Design a protein with these regions (language model features):
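Short alpha-helical Gxxx[C/S/T] motif in the catalytic ATP-binding
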Residues: 70, 74
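Short beta-strand/loop element within the Bergerat-fold HATPase_c
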Residues: 22-34
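Acidic ATP/Mg2+-coordinating residue in the GHKL
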Residues: 42
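A short beta-strand-to-loop motif within the catalytic HATPase_c
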Residues: 63, 87-91, 101
């Protein structure tokens, strides 16, 4: 199930930057103080500030035709496995999602 989180974030990142002249999606994996971390970043148009506190709310979406359940399911999966998901974004510059996993579980 944790693989589903990564797949969803990658899909979202690709969609977010597809209209950029030079789309870029980056994935980094590392340990922060012994905790496994994966980040998924894109250079899309970012998330507007007024939407930042809603991105993990079920059925909230800013995408045409989106269901709004993807990121809420991602958070549920990460929480269920003792991990976490967070997001930072800057309009016109892009978005980074950070996954932190329990020390005993890695993808």
């Amino acid at each position: 199930r944790q693989e589903q989180v990564l797949i969803n974030l990658l899909k979202n990142a690709v969609e977010a930057c597809q209209e950029r002249p030079y789309p870029e999606v980056r994935v980094n994996a590392f340990r922060r103080e012994g905790v496994p971390v994966i980040t998924v970043s894109d250079n899309g148009y970012g998330i507007v500030p007024e939407a930042m506190d809603k991105v993990f709310v079920p059925f909230f979406t800013t995408k045409q035709g989106g269901s709004g359940i993807g990121l809420s399911v991602c958070r549920q999966i990460m929480n269920r496995h003792g991990g976490s998901i967070s997001v930072i974004s800057e309009e016109e510059k892009g978005t980074t999602f950070t996954l932190q996993f329990p020390q005993t579980r890695v993808l």
